[in-house]
Structures are given as structure tokens and as C-alpha cells.
């Protein structure tokens, strides 16, 4: 069995530290090695006291070569865990402490803080409450070193839901929160008794509300517009103790609870066996070891991680890991250094967007010499220049898409290499995938970058207005230019197939038929192969509410793309088959099966349009090209021989949205029309493309009544 990676981590997430300027991190990891499985019933627990070669010390229960039962692990640098273990992972009650003095005491599960627990930071900040997968999640209370306090709901380390925040000077807010800021309905009460009760957004009042002081009240029908002139005069002449005169530019009490300023906690507590060279059986005396800490160019101590454990057996991953000696190794290092710099530079800029932020000319070149500079770290590659496009806009987009800035930076710019694979299409682009598979980086043509920057204001407005939009989520646009080398432009976007469920089949569907089949033999097709329109053998049945939401969103997204003169986009679909017969007889654990059952019933924890969407796939015989011609099939009786429908979990989104109908595409259409039906060609006018695409979607997605 291949053990998963585990980490013991102390992170100081001060705003300037965690976001790339400078941060501390002490990580613990044991190198994964092959070991024997631990039997639930037959494993014998021995009490050992063992000093490891690297100076670490373990004292406690040992079973099948890994910590099991209760035990204490002391690292040579002073970190310590004491508590319950299960099969080499901290599970149950335990206490973790760091040399800095920070501690966590409470429940652990699978090597992470999970359940009820108390964290005390080095500055005296204290959090008591619920944790989930290493993060504050659920109800919790936090006391800050400056005297402030918060009681309420948390989500992924941020205040989210209902909560009460009390400032040390007596000011108080009670109401709704979202992503760590005051948003929703709530009441602010100042220490002198003045109150504002109304709607909030991003920490400021919006919409309707009531301002009260003493016996006086002023109603607001939209922030900054008072209901009566008399009330306006009263407000203008009245000063509040904690803020300036109420206006659109009011400065409300600063909230000292951005979790980016918090002291980090233990990331992953787990032990993995290392079989000694003298042990040929693999099940005898074993010893733990951790990989050497690596000093990154930014000065941070960290370790390499290996891919996460997968419950469904070995899964082939696309591409190859970019390692030293790879032709694009320096390019990967450069983009990691650049993104780390960009995220750190703009992380603390929380101002509102300005029209000038969308200016395509808003691009900033930064020089990265190997020896480093005042603003850039030293590195091992050749000198290069780095360009950011509209950085403030993409900073806001990442917030809009609920991307944690620190997690984003660490996923791309940690000391794990990226995986590179070629485009499954004809673009010739290269793709880079983070090891956690959350983010994808794609090299782009200059013309595509121009299209994105031109449409950026309308794109931002569209995804802000329609939270369930299926169009690609863009997180950044950058350019790398080595000294004496060519420019490489690329975008960072979300990976649609980052899923806890195995993706068994994937399709890239345009609604056209000319050339829309995979050019591979049946034996060469695997789970990473992206199939096309003529390879599709299914129609998908969605429950009524899902179907209506999906079709409505497709219409909205297509209208947006049509207005931007975009064509040649695709619906990318990933299928997870629940039935073992449809997925090479891969078995599931009970917990995963229960979670799938909840999804199919419509009450799963991860349900969102395009992500973990429950459906039924009805298999039909292989469609022919004429099948996709207009009116060739209808929703109730698709052409082809039917088979029994099977339950699936779908992932889907609209991709490749940066091709406008330029002169090149017009010439392509004219040329291909000489050899094929013009209606079957992908390169057509955006209005026709949009209509054909939507008609096609309505043929393969059916309302399951």
C-alpha cells in the first residue's frame, strides 16, 4: 500500500508573510514508502521509545510499523504532537505545539484538525470551536490580542453566516458575514449608543437602512440618499464617535479579523513508515524519516509533497511532471516566481475597482535578476522579465470566485513541480496542471490575450451577476520573457475536473460534426482522452430543477459570448459512473458511496451547477454525422438504440471562449465550405454558432420528468 503524504506545519500567516513577500513555515513530512497493511483485528500494538537518525523521538504505540494508539512525537526542531494515532495518522484527541509557543489541543481526524478544538497563537489570539479538514469551520469563538472578539459561524477559516463582533472600544456588530467581511443584514452599534441597522456589502452599508442616535432616526432608501431634507441636515451636523459623518465614504470601525493575519496551524499530522535496509520482509522493524527541508528562493522553508491518496485505485494523470532537465523547467520556475510575486504584491489591495483597472495598457513589467532585487527574490534560473495584465481586476475575480489568496499561491508556487501536457485540441497550446489539480495554466497566443482583455469589463460584470455562470473562470493573465528569448503569454484558470470523484469519460462538444471525432483506435482511448461530438454515445437526463437551471444558464452564457463576437467554444463534460460495470469494476468505500447517494437524492454537500451535478446517462448507439443536423433528433426520442439509463455525476463548463470571428476564421469557413456542408463546420458566425450550440445542448440534455 502506498502511504499518503503528511505534514506537520506551523505557518505564520501575517498578511505580508503568507502572501509571498516573506513568510515562515516549518513543515513536517515523512517520505511515503511501501509498508504492510494494518489489520483492524490482528495488528499487535507494541510500546516503543525510538530515537531516529535525524534526531526525532517517538514514544508510544506501534502497530505494523506505524504509530497506533497513543504516542508522543518530538521533532529535533522542537515541534511536538502528543495524543491518539490511527494507522500512522493523528486521529482522536491530541495536542500539537510549536517552538514559537503556539498550540492546538482538540480533535484530529486523518492527520488534520477536525472536530472541536482550541488554538492559541503566539500573540495570545485564541480560537475555540469547530474545525473541518484543518480549517475553522462551523461555530467558533475567537479572542484577538488587541481585545476584539468574534462569536459566530465560520467557513474555510473565514467568518461566514451569522456572527457577533465586538471591538475593544465597545463598538459592536451583529448580523451576517460572507467570506470574512460584513455582508448581508446586520446592525452596527457604537459605544455611545448610536446605531445603524440595514444592509451591508463588503464591510460598508448599501441599500436600505436606518441610522439612529438618541431619539433621532434617519431612513436610507439607498446608501447616501436620505428620505427627508430635514434628516439630511441633521446627519450632516452630527458627528459619531467612531466614524466620520455618515456618507458614501464613511469609515467604519476596522475589523481585525482577516484570517490572513492569523497565526497558522498544524496542516497535516501523519506518520509514514520507512523500511530499513536491513528489513527484507517489509513488515519488521521500521523507522520514520522526513525529507530534508528545502530552502526556496523566497526564503521559505518547505517540503515536497506527493500526490494525494486516491480511493479508486491507480488513476492515470495527464501529462508529465516538469523536473530539472525538462526543456520547460526554467519556464515553470519563472512563472512560479512571477505568480508568487504578483499575488503577494496585490493581496492587501482591497480597494474598489476603477475603470482604469480594466485598461488593456495596465500591464507592469518586473525584472527578475538571478541575484534578486529589492522586490524580487534570488533564483536559480536565468534572468527574465515578468508582466502582469490588469492585476487588480484579477485580484477581485479571485475573491469573487472564493479563491483564498494564500492557498492559490501555495498551490501554484509551492515547491511541487507542475505537470505539463499538450492541448487535446488543435491550438498547439501547452497546459500546466498543479499537483492538487485545482488550477490549470495555459499558454496563449497574443490575439487570444487581446480578446480576453477587450472583453474583461463585460466578463467581470457577467460572472458577478450570474454566480452559476458556466464560462471559464480566469484567475490571472501573465507574460514571461527570458533575456534574449521569446515571450510566453499564459492564463491561469480553474480546472473543471478537479473532483473527489474519478472522471471516467470526458467530452469536448461544439455542436458541429465536421472532423468532430477522436483520431485514435479503441485500444488507445483511456480516461484522460478527450472525446468529441461524434464519439458521444449518451444523452443525459437531469431532474427538472437542474435541467431548467442548466438550460437557462447556457442561454445566458451564449448570449454573452455572442455579444462579444466569440465562437468556437465548447461544452466540456466529465462523467463519473456510479455503477461499477460502467467504470472498469472499480469499488468504492462505504463513505464515498453514501456521499454519492446523497448527491443523487439532491442533498449532497457539494451540489452546484456544473460541479457534482447528479444525472442519468442513457446510452444509445453511436451517433452518425447526420444525427447532429438540425431537427434530426428530438428530446424525447433520440436517434439510436436505447439502453437502460445509469446514474452519473457530471462536471461541465463552457471552455475556449477566447476565439473571436476574425478574418482568419472567416477564411477558414470559406475554405472548408468547399469540401463540407457549411452547417457542419465549427468556424461560423457567432450568432449562428450560438444558436447551433444551444440547439445541440437541448438535444443531448433532457428533462427527467
Curated annotation (Swiss-Prot):
Keyword terms of this UniProt record: ATP-binding, Cell membrane, Kinase, Membrane, Nucleotide-binding, Repeat, Transferase
MORN repeats: 58-80, 81-103, 104-126, 127-149, 150-172, 173-195, 196-218
Signal peptide (from-to): none
Activation loop: region residues: 661-682
Protein's name in the database: Phosphatidylinositol 4-phosphate 5-kinase 3
EC code: 2.7.1.68
Any one annotated GO CC term: cytoplasm
Broad class of enzyme this protein falls into: transferase
Cystine crosslinks: none
KO phenotype (gene knockout): Basal shift of ARAC3/ROP6 and ARAC4/ROP2 positioning and broad lateral localization of D6PK in root hair-forming cells leading to basal shift of root hair positions.
GO biological process, alphabetically ordered: phosphatidylinositol metabolic process; regulation of establishment of cell polarity; root hair cell tip growth; root hair elongation; root hair initiation
Example GO molecular function: 1-phosphatidylinositol-4-phosphate 5-kinase activity
The reaction(s) this protein catalyses: a 1,2-diacyl-sn-glycero-3-phospho-(1D-myo-inositol 4-phosphate) + ATP = a 1,2-diacyl-sn-glycero-3-phospho-(1D-myo-inositol-4,5-bisphosphate) + ADP + H(+)
Amino acid at each position: 500500500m502506498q502511504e499518503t503524504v503528511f505534514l506537520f506545519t506551523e505557518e505564520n500567516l501575517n498578511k505580508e508573510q503568507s502572501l509571498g513577500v516573506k513568510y515562515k513555515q516549518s513543515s513536517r513530512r515523512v517520505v511515503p514508502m511501501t509498508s504492510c497493511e494494518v489489520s483492524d483485528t490482528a495488528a499487535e500494538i507494541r510500546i516503543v521509545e525510538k530515537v531516529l537518525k535525524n534526531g526525532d523521538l517517538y514514544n508510544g504505540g506501534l502497530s505494523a510499523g506505524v504509530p497506533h494508539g497513543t504516542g508522543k512525537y518530538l521533532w529535533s526542531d522542537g515541534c511536538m504532537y502528543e495524543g491518539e494515532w490511527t494507522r500512522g495518522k493523528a486521529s482522536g484527541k491530541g495536542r500539537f505545539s510549536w517552538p514559537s509557543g503556539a498550540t492546538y489541543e482538540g480533535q484530529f481526524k486523518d492527520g488534520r484538525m477536525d472536530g472541536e478544538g482550541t488554538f492559541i497563537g503566539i500573540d495570545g489570539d485564541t480560537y475555540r470551536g469547530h474545525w473541518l479538514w484543518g480549517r475553522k469551520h462551523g461555530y467558533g469563538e475567537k479572542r484577538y490580542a488587541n481585545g476584539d472578539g468574534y462569536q459566530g459561524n465560520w467557513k474555510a477559516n473565514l467568518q461566514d453566516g451569522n456572527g457577533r463582533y465586538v471591538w475593544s472600544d465597545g463598538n459592536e456588530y451583529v448580523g451576517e458575514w460572507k467570506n470574512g467581511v460584513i455582508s448581508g443584514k446586520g446592525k452596527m452599534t457604537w459605544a455611545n449608543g448610536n446605531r445603524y441597522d440595514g444592509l451591508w456589502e463588503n464591510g460598508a452599508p448599501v441599500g436600505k437602512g436606518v441610522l439612529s442616535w438618541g431619539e433621532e432616526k434617519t431612513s436610507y432608501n439607498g446608501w447616501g440618499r436620505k428620505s427627508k431634507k430635514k434628516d439630511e441636515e441633521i446627519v450632516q451636523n452630527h458627528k459619531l464617535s467612531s466614524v466620520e459623518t455618515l456618507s458614501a465614504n464613511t469609515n467604519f470601525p476596522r475589523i481585525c479579523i482577516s484570517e490572513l493575519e492569523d497565526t497558522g496551524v498544524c496542516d497535516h499530522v501523519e506518520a509514514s513508515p520507512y523500511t530499513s535496509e536491513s528489513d527484507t520482509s517489509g513488515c519488521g522493524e521500521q523507522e520514520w524519516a522526513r525529507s530534508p527541508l528545502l530552502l526556496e528562493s523566497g526564503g521559505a522553508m518547505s517540503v515536497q509533497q506527493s500526490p494525494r491518496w486516491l480511493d479508486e485505485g491507480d488513476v492515470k494523470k495527464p501529462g508529465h511532471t516538469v523536473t530539472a532537465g525538462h526543456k520547460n523547467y526554467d519556464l515553470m520556475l519563472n512563472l512560479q516566481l512571477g505568480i508568487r510575486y504578483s499575488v503577494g504584491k496585490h493581496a492587501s489591495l482591497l480597494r474598489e475597482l476603477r475603470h482604469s483597472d480594466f485598461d488593456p495598457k495596465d500591464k507592469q513589467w518586473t525584472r527578475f535578476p538571478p541575484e534578486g532585487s529589492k522586490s524580487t527574490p534570488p533564483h536559480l534560473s536565468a534572468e527574465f522579465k515578468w508582466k502582469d495584465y490588469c492585476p487588480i481586476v484579477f485580484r477581485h475575480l479571485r475573491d469573487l470566485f472564493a479563491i483564498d489568496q494564500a492557498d492559490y499561491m501555495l498551490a501554484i508556487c509551492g515547491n511541487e513541480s507542475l505537470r505539463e501536457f499538450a492541448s487535446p485540441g488543435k491550438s498547439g497550446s501547452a497546459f500546466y496542471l498543479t499537483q492538487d489539480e485545482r488550477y490549470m495554466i495555459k499558454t496563449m497566443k497574443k490575439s487570444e490575450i487581446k480578446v480576453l482583455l477587450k472583453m474583461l469589463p463585460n466578463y467581470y460584470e457577467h460572472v458577478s451577476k450570474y454566480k452559476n455562470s458556466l464560462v471559464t473562470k480566469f484567475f490571472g493573465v501573465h507574460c514571461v520573457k527570458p533575456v534574449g528569448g521569446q515571450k510566453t503569454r499564459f492564463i491561469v484558470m480553474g480546472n473543471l475536473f478537479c473532483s473527489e470523484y474519478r472522471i471516467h469519460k470526458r467530452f469536448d462538444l461544439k455542436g458541429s460534426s465536421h472532423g468532430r471525432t477522436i483520431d485514435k483506435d479503441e485500444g488507445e482511448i483511456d480516461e484522460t482522452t478527450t472525446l468529441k461530438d461524434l464519439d458521444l454515445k449518451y444523452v443525459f437526463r437531469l431532474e427538472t430543477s437542474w435541467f431548467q437551471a442548466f438550460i437557462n444558464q447556457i442561454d445566458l452564457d451564449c448570449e454573452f459570448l455572442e455579444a462579444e463576437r466569440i465562437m468556437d467554444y465548447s461544452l466540456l463534460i466529465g462523467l463519473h459512473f456510479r455503477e461499477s460495470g460502467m467504470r472498469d469494476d472499480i469499488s468504492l468505500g462505504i463513505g464515498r458511496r453514501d456521499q454519492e447517494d446523497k448527491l443523487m437524492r439532491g442533498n449532497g454537500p457539494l451540489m452546484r451547477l456544473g460541479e457534482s451535478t447528479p444525472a442519468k446517462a442513457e446510452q444509445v448507439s453511436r451517433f452518425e454525422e447526420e444525427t447532429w443536423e438540425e431537427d434530426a433528433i428530438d428530446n424525447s426520442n433520440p436517434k439510436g438504440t436505447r439502453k437502460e439509463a445509469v446514474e452519473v455525476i457530471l462536471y461541465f463548463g463552457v471552455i475556449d471562449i477566447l476565439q473571436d470571428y476574425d478574418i482568419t476564421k472567416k477564411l477558414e469557413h470559406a475554405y472548408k465550405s468547399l469540401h463540407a456542408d457549411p452547417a457542419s463546420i465549427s468556424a461560423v458566425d457567432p450568432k449562428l454558432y450560438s444558436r447551433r450550440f444551444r440547439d445541440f445542448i437541448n438535444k443531448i440534455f433532457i428533462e427527467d420528468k
